[in-house]
A protein has these predicted regions:
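Glycine-rich nucleotide-binding loop
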Residues: 239
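C-terminal nucleotide
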Residues: 1-59, 66-96, 100-236, 244-264
């Protein structure tokens, strides 16, 4: 399929999926963590579909990477690639994108990113724990279901209200740890619980992530319904995008992704 018309259109650079713990990569959040490091999980997924723009799949970062590296990841250490991409994307930005966007694109497999404000100012992880087990990747590809909801609209800013309670920042970082542990153990129930905890943290810390006058869709009722019916659910990013549902059974209307692991 590498030479198919769709593959040529999309390009060879992977996509990235953010799971539990997102926002802990931002120094304005992780500086309030009383129990550092706080963790989050990113997953590299195959570029076999075109994601909606402005939907939490790091399509903006990937677009920059496509231009910077002419459609293909260079054969260099992923840490080096992530830092280079971070510098290019955030040059002159008042509100820089978090480093998880870049790391998720260039690190294969499932990655737990540990952030500590005392290490590199909380901009880059103090440690990255990676899982490139084909068995785990196949399992995760089977239990994650993406349901398109709606891209975040123009004029939307998720940072209008910040309730950065240290206790809730600690819970956010713990949701990432729980998420990674559940994936490595292939425990769908605990994975769903980690995604649900992540959403409680987002709703508490940064309420405009899920509630905002510019949003045309009521995100919370959709989230709650899927959390009640399935093992767990979270939005792919601020303002909606996709609803990521954890289920060992099919989810009508959703599609599945292919988790990429390091090639031996």
């Amino acid at each position: 399929m590498k030479n198919s018309p769709v593959a040529k259109l999309i390009g060879a650079i992977p996509n990235r999926l953010q799971l539990a713990g997102g926002w802990i990569d931002q120094p304005f959040v992780n500086q309030h963590n009383p129990k550092p490091p706080g963790s989050m999980v990113v997953v590299q997924i195959a570029p076999d579909f075109r994601p909606m723009d402005r939907s939490g799949i790091a399509s903006g970062t990937r677009h920059i990477a496509m231009k910077l590296w002419k459609g293909k990841l260079p054969n260099r250490p992923p840490e080096e690639l992530a830092r280079a991409l971070y510098e290019v994307e955030n040059k002159g930005k008042a509100e820089p994108s978090g480093s998880q966007d870049m790391i998720g694109l260039v690190y294969p497999g499932v990655n737990r990113l540990d952030y500590d404000f005392k290490v590199q100012g909380g901009v880059f992880p103090s440690h990255i724990e990676s899982c490139n087990s084909p068995k785990v990747a196949k399992w995760l590809s089977r239990v994650l279901h993406l349901l398109p909801v709606e891209p975040r609209p123009d004029g939307y800013n998720p940072l209008g209200v910040k309730n950065l309670s240290p206790a809730w920042v600690a819970k956010l970082g713990q949701s990432g740890q729980d998420c990674y542990d559940a994936i490595v153990k292939m425990d769908a129930k605990k994975l769903g619980a980690a995604l649900n905890l992540n959403m409680k943290c987002w709703e508490t810390l940064l309420p405009h992530v899920v509630r905002h006058p510019a949003l045309r869709v009521e995100l919370i009722p959709i989230l709650k319904a899927y959390q009640q019916q399935y093992l767990g659910a979270m939005y792919s990013g601020c303002g909606g995008g996709y609803l990521i549902v954890v289920s060992e059974k099919p989810v009508p209307g959703a599609f599945q992704v292919n988790v990429r692991v390091a090639q031996k």
